[in-house]
Every structure is written in structure tokens, then in C-alpha cells.
């Protein structure tokens, strides 16, 4: 084996097995070196035709190399075999040792004279003239120097510049026989390899061996090159995949991913929102608020109509109202009617954990809006970003966002053509500088719908489902006092789901009443097993509430009473006013307290003070809240007068004691009134409790029948 190491070409290993087999083994060679000259001369007389029978015979045509020209053999031999010099004084890499000798062979047997080795071989004895002529024509070629060491990029670079011998090596190694044979000009008339070997008087057996060694070396070089390229390609692919996984892991980390993100997160606000399918026809039950916003839309469509009189486009509109009344729906209707760019943002989208992000997003939002003026910006949950500025060590930089919002709405730079619509259900938390004229010029209240508005909303949502003609939306509207638009939509949807579960083809009043009770009293829990004793206590408890509500003048009418467990309670009495109540009188508040006391009073009268239960805790909470508001907010206490007390913690001990005394008096009087009514109507109380134990649920008409002493129809 010869090791071909080059700094220019990849390492090529050329096995010349057939040529080396012609020489003796290492031991025989070492002996032949010390043989006298006379013995060598005697061996030279061996006939040439007595070649060893072990020499292999190979056809060059089988390797595909028979078409080589004659002129290629000289350069091929120059690139393949090293030159031999008898004079050891010639400077050569064969006489240079960096770590040890040039090969393991010389480490073991010492330096040999190559001509002596050749002359002692059987091949030389058989063909002395042929080998002598070949070796005389061979040129010095240092490519077969065995270079041993750590194969690193640093060591290879150092070898290129370490010694002049390496530079000579790099100069003599032309792109070797691989590049020479593949890129040679094919138009040149070169002699074939076969003719050249015949000219040099090389026997056919040795020609085949020589060509076989050449072919094997060429194929080995190609295989090693391909293997190296494949390894590099796989390594690069693995590193690239690991890099992608690393970047993905950083992006998934909530703390590190922010550093790789720009000021996105407000993409929905920066891009205009199209709301072509929502108009003011979809808004029901809030006619006054809708009228206010329709004027703004008209201003956007035809500004000359208003500016001819010197009017200006309003800069901000603040929508205020309880949850579910349609504030966001109104803003969407403005977007659909105005036909101008509409930008949406939520108050919680501005601020994050890093300082300055909120102010930057405010600037980006208004910069985009000004570039597309006239336009509308809708900020939902405005109290999240526009709350009052306070000095707090927990949020020392929270004022930057609202300050930037104030400057953009009405600051030094003009802001023409951009209308800001804000929505909140907590206007008390807004900063005073934000709600002043010039920023939010208009404040529109979006209240809960009245009976007429609830009827319109129910008709709108009923038209989206299949319902029976016997359904009367006005009856449902009168029984849903205080419901918002969102709650009415949920009521209709729950009724449709109930009808689908029961296998009905359309929604009837039964499903609507069921969904109303489910919203008012909670879902039924029929799987709960209650013993007769607790069921009896619950029946008398709920009957006590119903008796007080029925016989108290200013109490709200009864809607339904049940001892079916619903939600967290074992029973419930639903009260609904006949009409919308815009305010409440002192008599109505006292009646509510009396109704709340009815449950505990009934337990005490029927079962005794030792058997009262904890079921009245929520009733006492409700009664105490009413009494406290009457004393501290409504000015309904004769002793304390019309003064209000918003923060009782800052009051003097005497005042606090007086407030507590007045609340205690109101509760005691309410308890006594409820006890008087139940003692007076003890028979009706008993009949109603027995009816509840029998039927579990009674509506207003059935309760009236029982209290009048009549019998209910068998269900």
C-alpha cells in the first residue's frame, strides 16, 4: 500500500498489490541486502520465461481502461510512482523525518537501497532490462510521503507554511491523475496506454497488474471523496436542525421570546377591520345611544353639512353602561355604516412587562390612523389603559401609556379626522383629563333595555330560530326585568338547545320559560337525593318567603316558587316586578327586607329556635345590605338624617356605633313584621308548603290558587 497525502488533493490510497507481490517478503528482502554480489549475478542468469506462477493475470478491458492513449503512460507513471536516486545526498522528502521514519517498514527494518531491493527480487531477475528502463524514466514525485499526525484544520494549515519542502510538495502535486485524466483535452491525439507499455517492453502480465493498481487507486480516491462530502453534508444538516430547534425554544420561552419580537401584539389594531355585515339595524333596545352614533356616522359621510356652520368633527365618544348592553355592537355598527377605516384595540393590549411598550403601541396605532384619516378608533375596556394616574411604587411607569394617549387625542400636534370611541362599564375609574371635552366630547349612556327594548331584542333573536306561533315575546319580556341584550340572546339560545334535546321541531313557551328559570334560579339538580326532613324544612322556608311577598303591599309579585335544588340552593322563590323600576321607595326597600326575613321566621315558628338552619344566611346578607344602604347612602334614617357615609372606616367610633344601631333597628323591625304576617296566615303557610312538597314547583297562578284555599289540578 502506498499512502498518497497531498495538501491540494484529498488523500488517495493506491494499492499496488500485484506489483508488490512480485517482491520478496520483508525478511527475504533484508537478507538479500547482505548477499554478496556474486550471488546476485548468479541470480541474474535466471531465464525470463520462468516467471512465478502466482502472478495474477487481469484483463484491462474489464476495468474500462483499454481506450487510454499511448502518450498518457508517461504522465501517469510520473504521477503514480516515486523516483529513485542512488545518491543519498540528494535532498528529498524520503530523507526527511518529522516524527519517525517515513514508514513503519523503515522503523522496523531500517533504510533500504531501492536498487538493491529491486535487484534482489525475482521480478528483477526475470526482467532486468525492463525494470531498469522504467525506473530510469521515473521522475521524483514526493506524493507518497507518509504524513502522520492529528488531522485538523489547524495542523493542515500549519503544514502548508511550515517548511519549504511542503511548498515543493504542493507545487509538484498537480491536480493529480484524477483531474488530469478527467479534464484532459480529448481532441489531442495521444497514444494509448497499451501501446506505450508495449514500447517500454512491459510484459502483459505486469501491464495488467499495473493497470489494476491504477484503477483501484482511482476508484478508492473517488469513494473517499464522496464519503467525506456526505459526512460534511450530514454534519451541516444536523447543525442546521439543532439551530432551528434552539430558535424555536427561545421563541416559546415567555421571558426570552419578548426580546426577539418587535412591537407586534397590536396587529389587530394596526390593520383596519371590515364590518360590512353589521349595521344599526342589528342594534335593538338602545334607541337614544344609536341616534347619537348615527349623527357621528353622518358627520363622517357628509362633513360639509356640519362644517358649513363652523362645527367641528367630535374627537371622542365614550360609551358607558353595564355589561352586555351593546356597547361593542354599537361600535361595530359604526364601522359598518361609516364606510371608513375602523381600528380596534382592547385596553389590555397596550401594556406588557417591558417599560415603554404601551406608549409605543399607542403611537403606532395613531400613526396608522392619521395616515388613513378620516377613520374611527375603537378602544374597548378603556378603563384598563385610561385609569386614574396614581403614584405607586408597584407601577412607576404606568402613566406613560395614558400620557401618550392624552397627547395623541388632544396634544400639541393636531389630530384631525380621527374619531376615538371608547367603551367602559367602570367610568368612575377613568382619569379626569381623559374624559374632558376636547378628548371625549360626548358621553353616551347605554342602559339596560326596557320592556319595549326587550321585546324588540327577543323578536330579533327569535327570528333566527324556529319557534311556535303561540310564543309571545312580550310576555317573556315582562318576565325578564333587568335582563340585558346579551342575557336575552342567551335565553333564546338556551330554549333552542332545550327543544333540540327534547326532540322537538320548534321552540315553544315551555322551553322559553325553562330557560328563563334556569337563568334566574340556576339549573335543576334532579339527581340530588334529599331526605324528607330537609325537604320539609325547605318547603316551609320557601313558603315563608312566598307568604310575605304575597301579603306585603309594596313587595314584588311572585314569579315562581320551587323546592327543586337549583345551583347552590335547595329551593328558590323568584320575584319579578310588573313594570320596570327606575327607582325604589322606602316602603319597597322595607318590603324586600321583610321577604328576606320570611324564611328564617318560618323555620322558627314551625320547628322552633333549636331547629333553625343555615339556609337563611344569604337572606340575612341581602337584608343587611339593604338596611346599610338605607342608612349610609339613601338618607332614610331618622336619627342620622340625610347625611351619607361613603367610607365608614374613617368615621368616629360614635358615628359608627350610631350607624350600626340604626341598621340593627331596621332589621329587628323587619323580622317582627315578617313574624306577624306568618302568624296571621299560618293556615295558608301550611297549605302552600304541602303543595310544594307535592308538586315541587309552583308558578304565580298556582300559588294564588293555593292561598285562596282552592285545590290544584292533578298534573
Swiss-Prot record:
Residues binding ATP, per UniProt: 283, 325-329
Ranges per topology, Mitochondrial intermembrane: 259-715
Location in the cell: Mitochondrion inner membrane; Mitochondrion
Matching CDD domains: RecA-like_FtsH
UniProt catalytic activity: ATP + H2O = ADP + phosphate + H(+)
Effect of residue 542 to Q: Loss of protease activity
Keyword Nucleus: no
InterPro entries linked to this entry: AAA+_ATPase, AAA_lid_3, ATPase_AAA_core, ATPase_AAA_CS, FtsH, P-loop_NTPase, Peptidase_M41, Peptidase_M41-like
Cofactor note: Binds 1 zinc ion per subunit.
Domain of life from the UniProt record: Eukaryota
SMART domains: AAA (SM00382)
Gene null: resulting phenotype: Complete embryonic lethality; embryos present a clear developmental delay at 8.5 dpc, and the hearts of mutant embryos fail to beat properly at 9.5 and 10.5 dpc. Cardiomyocyte-specific gene disruption gives rise to animals that develop dilated cardiomyopathy and myocardial fibrosis at about 20 weeks after birth; mutants have a median life span of about 46 weeks, much shorter than wild-type. Mitochondria from mutant cardiomyocytes are smaller than normal, but have normal cristae architecture and display no significant difference in the assembly of respiratory complexes.
Active-site residue numbers: 542
Similarity remark: In the N-terminal section; belongs to the AAA ATPase family. In the C-terminal section; belongs to the peptidase M41 family.
Protein name from the UniProt record: ATP-dependent zinc metalloprotease YME1L1
Organism, as annotated: Mus musculus
Taxonomic placement: Eukaryota, Metazoa, Chordata, Craniata, Vertebrata
